Amino acid sequence: MDVSGPSSPRRTIRRPALISLMLGLTLCLFCLIPGKAQAQTPSPLSEWQYSAGVLLRSKFENPLPTWDVSVGAATSLQPRYVGSSEYHVQPGINLDVRYKDIAFFSMGEGLGVNLLRGENFRAGVALGFDVGRDQDDSSQLRGLGDISPAPEAKVFAEYTIFPVVLRTAVRRGFGGNNGWVGDISAYLPVAGSERFFVFVGPTATYADSSYMRRYFGINPNQSIRSGYRQFTPGSGFSSAGFGSSAVWFWTEHWFMTADGAYQRLLGDAADSPITRAHSQLTLNLSVAYRF
């Protein structure tokens, strides 16, 4: 989640070479840590929650800093897989890097470029990562095999009808699920001060049959190994939900974020034999330092 924080001329980083080196070392480490700490899908939070306030920020802070970098630690309470009734705690890192209003790297948005930019909109492309699914994550997945991690490409757009931000994104996996997924969401600030902000908003997700079969389907071989009945889902809306994101700067640089999300599985995703809970909850806490 991106935040603007208290005003300060020191927010503009004057040592881009140092920042580039730091970013490079961080990304090297990033490739070595568990996949679920990376920019990912299926994401436990709505995508807008990773970038809440970015588009609105340009209305109140002009010019934007050349570099905006924050890094910290995070922990998340989330289902073991989409549709699970079991929960676990997943640690990770919180990394957000932005260059003006041009390029970015964040945990939920991935590595991207804003190709079109205006006072009330932005649109671009990004490269993310589908972490896949490991059958050892839950006894409810035994016999289904693993879904391999794979990169995915994304096209996104945001538009502001102040104070509401509308967002849509379409992504395509390459390996793993090889499917198309689209998200549409909206969010707005409901509370705020110089050091404290709260955003809330709904999200709906549509997935094609390839994605649905990979994550919610049961083919004949999987049916034999797992004991589940065969199930061939089609395309359609897979979920709808609501999220909230809050940030508190207790100093000029240190801040805490709290994110919560409720997701309701729909259609064939809800009817899948591996779906044990239609309602999915996620809580995420992080502490980070903004340079």
Predicted regions and their residues:
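Residues that define the transmembrane beta-barrel architecture of outer-membrane proteins
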Residues: 67, 87-93, 119, 147-153, ...
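Cleavable N-terminal export/targeting peptides
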Residues: 1-64
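Outer-membrane beta-barrel domain signature
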Residues: 60, 80-84, 112, 140-146, ...
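Short glycine/proline- and aromatic-enriched beta-strand/turn motifs that initiate or cap beta-hairpins
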Residues: 38-103
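Transmembrane beta-strands of outer-membrane beta-barrel pores
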Residues: 75-81, 99-101, 127-133, 161-163, ...
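Residues on the lipid-exposed face of transmembrane beta-strands in outer-membrane beta-barrel proteins
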Residues: 73-77, 93-99, 111-115, 155-159, ...
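Repeated loop/turn-to-beta-strand initiation elements of outer-membrane beta-barrel proteins
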Residues: 69, 101-105, 121, 163-167, ...
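Outer-membrane beta-barrel transmembrane domain signature
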Residues: 41-44, 49, 53, 174-175, ...
